[in-house]
Structures are given as structure tokens and as C-alpha cells.
Amino acid sequence: MTTPTSILILAAGQGTRMRSSLPKVLQPLAGRPLLSHVLDTARSLDPHRLVVVYGHGGDRVREAFPEDDIRWVHQAEQRGTGHAVQVALPETDADDRVLILYGDVPLVRGETVRRLLAQLDEGGDLVILTAALKSPTGYGRILRDDSGRVQRIVEEKDASDSERRVNEVNTGIMAARASDFTRWLSKVTNDNAQGEFYLTDCVALANTEGRRVEAVVGHEAIELMGVNDKRQLAEQERAYQRREAERLMVQGVTVIDPARLDVRGEVEAGRDVSLDINVILQGSVKLGEGAKVGAGCVIIDSEIGPGAHILPHTVIEGAVIGAGASVGPFARIRPGTHTDSNAKIGNFVEVKNARVGEGSKINHLSYVGDSELGRDVNIGAGTITCNYDGANKHKTIIGDRAFIGSNTALVAPLTVGEGATIGAGTTLNKDAPPGELTVARAKAITIPGWKRPVKKPKE
């Protein structure tokens, strides 16, 4: 039987180097708070207990994560990582495996920490996660004896010159039994340069007891690095986006430039999808096989059908785009929109909460809102559905094969029948019968001899 795992996430730091009123763990990475990414990793391990230690910006942090699987522990005074773990341990059972994660280390992978827990199960009493860095400045150093065994961790402020030359660093992530952490932390003092209770002192205490201290070296240094300022936040953002681009490319997606793709949610993509530069995919996005997304497009919580073509600089939110449809360039598709197969929405068109039938076209310079269009409808340039009367929204229904002339205003609620034609320049405020031409247009008048006004001479 597997020993239950409790995961403690330390998220109480103030993050002064961020120079922000937003608590550090709420800073956005790929459109979500740093802490959200760590919680995803923690939940992938199916923990017995999930405990978050919070402090700075307490209520804001808790309100951002209302999920009921989190146990919140308040660290009123930030007295170091050892103290943070100490206040959280009462939420665990004595025999639990306890894994320590950090709210500002967002890219750690589930498989990496599984290696840590496996080492604990194989006989380690304390297992720490380390990284080898070319530039280890700012991190605690891992000190080993001549046989390679970990002896202790020294924080940079307390390290000698020779110790600072060590490039294997502590990530802070570690695992041990709850009862062992409780015993070791009861012996930790704050006799150090920062006057804090260091969690890392557990390494030396475990060695003093003759316990087995193991180190697992992370494969990818960036996933183990913390975020302390906006520069590091930007570095982590790029690392996350590289990871997402690689994941998509492995699945058969063509990413024109992996450095210019932003994924801010969950993306499912079929084979032979193509993503041009500066595309942003946000929320839950599904891209059907062979779909093409042009440069500068933003797609939010939407589904793009197989073979659909989204032309450059189009924004799509909360919509379903049918197979083979074409949208853009410079189109805006708002929530509630559903286009059927082979529909076409062209440049400078806005569509909101509308159904656009198979093969229908809204080619340019139009607004279609709260509407239902049948098959093979043609909407001329400059057509506006007048859906709002100042208090309520009203629906426009346009039947199959209807033709709406340019510069037409459709004052909802109304229905345009199948095969009807609406003459250009019409303001339509009543239903139009099927198969007939309906026109509402003032007669053109020519005024003989009319002259333009002459400007008065300047005084």
C-alpha cells in the first residue's frame, strides 16, 4: 500500500522585488497566477492533503483559489521556510510522505517530483531536488563530502568564497516523512545572516542522526527556478511558451516560429494545423485537423473546425467555427457565435451571438448580432443588424439563400424569408416575405442650379 502524500506549498512571501501591489504568487504566467501552475503539478500527484501556506496578501490569495481541496494555513510572520513548514505540518499525518513545493516555482513538472518521491520510497530519509547552474548567484549551495554524499546546504549569504564557487544549488523542493520534518524543525535555530529558520538546516540535522540524505538532480534547470522579479517572470514565460510550442509540434502542428507563439490555457490540436507568428491561444482552444491560423490572431475559448482558415489579425472568443470556414482578416467573432461549414466572414466584420449557416457569406464591413442566418445567405458590405433598442436585445432571422444588399439596416426583431432580396440602402423594420424584393429607399432628387456654399473671406 502506498504511503499517503501530503503536499505543502509555501506561498507566503511578499515578493518585494516584483515592485507590484499584486502578491507574488498571483503574478501571471501564461495568463494564470504562478500558484495555479504549482497547484496543477501538485494535483497531478493525487495527494492525500494539499496545504498552502499563505501570508502576504492573504485574503487576495485565498479568494483567487476557492477550490475546496486546499487547506489554507496562515503564516502571520514570515520567519523563513523552516517556520512556514512548521506551521503547516499539523495539517498532515505523522506517517505521511511530505513534499515541499513553492508557489513561485511554477514550471516544476509532475514527473520530476515523482522521481523525488520514488527515491524516498527506495530508502531515502530526506530527498532534495537540486540543479546545476552556470550562474548560481542567489541560491543555496549543495555541499557534498568526498564520497559525493550530501552533507548540508549553505545559503549564499552564509557561504564562504569557496562554497560560493559550487554550482549545484538547492531548489528548496524536498521530501521526507512528516514525523521526521517535525523532529528536525524543532531543532532548527535562526542563528544565521538573515535571522530566519531555514528548512535547509534539516539536511545537516538528518546527517547528524545518521539518516540517509539523497539528492535528485533536475534534468532542466529552468523548471526548478524561482520567480523573484519581473525579469525572471519574463524568462519563465518564454520557457513555458517554448515548452508548449514543442508539445504542439510533437503532435504534428506546424509552428512557424516557436518564439512567437503564446499559449495561455489548454490547447488541443489535430494534425497539420498551422500557426503563424504572434498567435495567442487562450483558455480552452480546440483546433481541428488542417486548420490554419494567420499572423496576429487571438483565439479564446473557441473551437476551430477541420480545414478552417483564420486569416491574420482576427479575434475569436467563445465561438465555434465550422469545417472549411474562412474568417478574417481583421474580423471580430464574439461569444455565442457558431458558423457552419464553409461559411465566410471577411474583413472588418463583427459577429456576436449568431448562427451563420453553411456556405453563407458576410464578406466585409458589417455587424451581425443576435441573429440566425440560414444556408447560402449573402450579406452585403455595410449591413448592420440593429439588435438593441436601448433596453433589450432582439433577434434577426434570415432564411436560406437570402440576399441582403449593401448598406442595409435590419431593425430587429424581424425575419427575412427564404430567397428574399433586400435592396441596397434599405432600412428594414418589418418582416420581408420569401422570394420577393423588398426595398425601403428615398427617391433620388437632382436640384438644378444648386451651388455649394462659398467660404467667407478671412478678415
UniProtKB/Swiss-Prot annotation:
Q: List the Gene Ontology MF annotations in alphabetical order.
A: glucosamine-1-phosphate N-acetyltransferase activity; magnesium ion binding; UDP-N-acetylglucosamine diphosphorylase activity
Q: What is its main location?
A: cytoplasm
InterPro entries on file: Bifunctional_GlmU (IPR005882), GlmU-like (IPR050065), GlmU_C_LbH (IPR038009), Hexapep (IPR001451), MobA-like_NTP_Trfase (IPR025877), Nucleotide-diphossugar_trans (IPR029044), Trimer_LpxA-like_sf (IPR011004)
Binding positions (Mg(2+)): D104, N228
List the GO terms this entry assigns under cellular component, sorted alphabetically. cytoplasm; membrane
Q: What is its EC number?
A: 2.7.7.23, 2.3.1.157
Active site positions, chain numbering? H364
Offer one Pfam family short name for this entry: Hexapep
Q: Which SUPFAM superfamilies match?
A: Nucleotide-diphospho-sugar transferases, Trimeric LpxA-like enzymes
GO terms for biological process, alphabetical = cell morphogenesis; cell wall organization; lipid A biosynthetic process; peptidoglycan biosynthetic process; regulation of cell shape; UDP-N-acetylglucosamine biosynthetic process
User: Cellular location of this protein?
Assistant: Cytoplasm
Show the segment(s) annotated as Linker: 231-251
State whether it acts alone or in a complex, and with which partners, per the record.
Answer: Homotrimer.
> Which family does the record claim for this protein?
In the N-terminal section; belongs to the N-acetylglucosamine-1-phosphate uridyltransferase family.
What is the protein name given in its UniProt record? Bifunctional protein GlmU
Report the source organism. Thioalkalivibrio sulfidiphilus (strain HL-EbGR7)
- State the encoding gene: glmU
